[in-house]
């Protein structure tokens, strides 16, 4: 019986519930768990509301987040589902990338329509690159007037379009999480319909191995008679031996060829995402490369110094700063394997940022880093983390 849990013969996706406080995110999560456990009992185990709501505290890079993880399967897919009960938890989770989502269910109470946090969550989802949103119009059993439901649906679609999602075509499913939990047949079906919409509409994620190769350099050393070796953990892609690569970041871009690949002291024909490996680089000296650069497929990533970011600043209790900072604050930005100093400019109208706040900012680094939108980083002072963020837009 239990064996079915570990059969990974279905595509795996990470999804989550987002939306305004008390619109029913956690109740919907519990309802999905129950409905699927009833429908496919062999592969699903029901998790009740209490277990999800009392989400354990997790530490991600020193930031405390309450977040619940549950898993379930439909006929087509295996899902890992994250539910962050509190608004602050959700914001931290999105910005720190504690749980990357392939798609999200935006929960909007039909009784209220979109509220302040609904907007903020959708904006954040776009900024951190959640690829797909669909909508659960929850508490639909409490609205008798069909026209009112249509109106709320229109409002939600408009909000999605405003934030750069496909509001016209996003599925909007009318559900009642509470009634589904109580076993009311009409509303159980609504949750089944919702999961069918998730199955059909959230695209399969691009597997890491299918992306262009990238390995952050952690260490550099010389093997006498053979040349310079860089080591690190391949972040994505595959790299066959004798491929051309670029070394990007910190210094001008260099081109070279990988003439040897080693893992656990064995010679390999290719390096793959997720593996720790050593790459032998043709014609480069020990001093030509350093920690903090990346080895990548030529042309796949470029070095940049100026960017916009969305950042969460740790509270004092989380070990962060004790006092606010202002524009021109110069901390270290830790990208992948190295710290680079950067100058912060706060947005117009933001005088200062307090510990525990989340904010947008513009950053100018003193050295270029291999960068793309969505890349995560930590903000550090003297080696301790005081914030965590993501690149939302590259300026130069």
From Swiss-Prot:
Q: Sorted alphabetically, which keywords does the UniProt record give?
A: Cytoplasm, Elongation factor, GTP-binding, Hydrolase, Magnesium, Metal-binding, Nucleotide-binding, Protein biosynthesis
Major localisation: cytoplasm
Q: Any idea of its EC number?
A: 3.6.5.3
Give the location in the cell.
Cytoplasm
> Residue ranges of region G2?
62-66
Binding residues annotated for Mg(2+), in chain numbering = 26
Give the start-end ranges of region G4: 138-141
Where does the tr-type G domain start and stop, copy by copy? 10-206
Domain of life per record: Bacteria
- Give the matching Pfam families: GTP_EFTU, GTP_EFTU_D2, GTP_EFTU_D3
Location of region: G3: 83-86
Recorded catalytic reaction(s): these are:
GTP + H2O = GDP + phosphate + H(+)
Q: InterPro entries, from UniProt?
A: EF-Tu_GTP-bd, EF-Tu_GTPase, EFTu-like_2, EFTU_2, G_TR_CS, P-loop_NTPase, Small_GTP-bd, T_Tr_GTP-bd_dom
Residues covered by region (G1)? 19-26
* Binding sites annotated in the UniProt record for GTP: 19-26, 83-87, 138-141
GO molecular function annotations of the record:
GTP binding; GTPase activity; translation elongation factor activity
List, alphabetically, the GO terms of the cellular component aspect: cytosol
Assembly description: Monomer.
Role this protein plays: GTP hydrolase that promotes the GTP-dependent binding of aminoacyl-tRNA to the A-site of ribosomes during protein biosynthesis.
Q: Which family does it belong to?
A: Belongs to the TRAFAC class translation factor GTPase superfamily. Classic translation factor GTPase family. EF-Tu/EF-1A subfamily.
The protein, known as: Elongation factor Tu
Q: Which organism is it from?
A: Kocuria rhizophila (strain ATCC 9341 / DSM 348 / NBRC 103217 / DC2201)
């Amino acid at each position: 019986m239990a064996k079915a849990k570990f059969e990974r013969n279905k595509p795996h996706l990470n999804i989550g519930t987002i939306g305004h406080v008390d619109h029913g995110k956690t109740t919907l999560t519990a309802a999905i768990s129950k409905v699927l456990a009833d429908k496919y009992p062999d592969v699903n185990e029901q998790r009740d509301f209490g277990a999800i709501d009392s989400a354990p505290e997790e530490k991600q890079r020193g930031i405390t987040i309450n977040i619940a993880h549950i898993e379930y399967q439909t006929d087509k897919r295996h899902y890992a589902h994250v539910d962050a009960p509190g608004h602050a938890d959700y914001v931290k989770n999105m910005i720190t990338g504690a749980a990357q989502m392939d798609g999200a269910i935006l929960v909007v109470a039909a009784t209220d329509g979109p509220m302040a946090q609904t907007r903020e969550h959708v904006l954040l989802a776009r900024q951190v690159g959640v690829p797909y949103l669909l909508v659960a119009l929850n508490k639909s059993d409490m609205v008798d007037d069909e026209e009112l439901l249509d109106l709320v649906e229109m409002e939600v679609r408009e909000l999605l379009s405003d934030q750069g999602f496909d509001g016209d075509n996003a599925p909007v499913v009318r559900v009642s999480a509470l009634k589904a939990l109580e076993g009311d047949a009409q509303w159980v079906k609504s949750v089944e319909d919702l999961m069918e919409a998730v199955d059909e509409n959230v695209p399969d994620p691009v597997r890491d191995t299918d992306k262009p190769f990238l390995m952050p350099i952690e260490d550099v050393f010389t093997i006498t008679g053979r040349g310079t070796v860089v080591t690190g953990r391949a972040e994505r892609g595959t790299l066959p031996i004798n491929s051309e690569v670029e070394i990007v970041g910190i210094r001008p871009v260099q081109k070279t060829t990988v003439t040897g690949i080693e893992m656990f002291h064995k010679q390999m024909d290719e390096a793959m995402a997720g593996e720790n490996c050593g790459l032998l680089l043709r014609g480069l000296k020990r001093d030509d490369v350093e920690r903090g650069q990346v080895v990548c497929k030529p042309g796949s990533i470029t070095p940049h110094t100026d960017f916009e970011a969305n950042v969460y600043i740790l509270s004092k209790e989380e070990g962060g700063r004790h006092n606010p900072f202002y524009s021109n604050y110069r901390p270290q930005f830790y990208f992948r394997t190295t710290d680079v100093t950067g100058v912060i400019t706060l947005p117009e109208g933001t005088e200062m940022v307090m510990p525990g706040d989340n904010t947008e900012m513009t950053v100018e680094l003193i050295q270029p880093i291999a960068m793309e939108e969505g890349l995560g980083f930590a903000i550090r002072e003297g080696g301790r983390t005081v914030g965590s963020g993501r690149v939302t837009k590259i300026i130069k």
